[in-house]
Amino acid sequence: ASRLIDIHSQHQNLILASEEFRNASARIVLLHIPLGNGTWHGNIHLEELFLPILNDADIDVMLSGHTHRYSFHPANDKVRFPVLVNDNESLLKCDVGDGKITARIYGPEGTVTHSHEFPLK
């Protein structure tokens, strides 16, 4: 297991050090299981694996699912980027422009149920 973690961490470090990542206009992380708000062993493992890398990567926002419930977690001392979790019945759309990421969640009826803006770093 530790070898897998080492390989995974090395791969993430290569991506984050790449010219494409450094020059990206927006840095959005997609991760099924949200970081920073769980006590399940899977959450803890992912936090140990990814937080040291992502916290230093100027991430604009993380988009997640897993819980099947909407939630929003602003950046804090543990997770230094906002985490937006979508439920299992809604559509999440993001637009990048004008120095920000605009995220809108559309419920089953097609109306906006939640909206967030994240300034680009």
Name every feature range the model reports, one short phrase each.
Residues Y70-K121:
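Binuclear metal-dependent phosphoesterase catalytic core
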Residues A1-V79, V112-P119:
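His/acidic metal-ligating clusters that form di-metal
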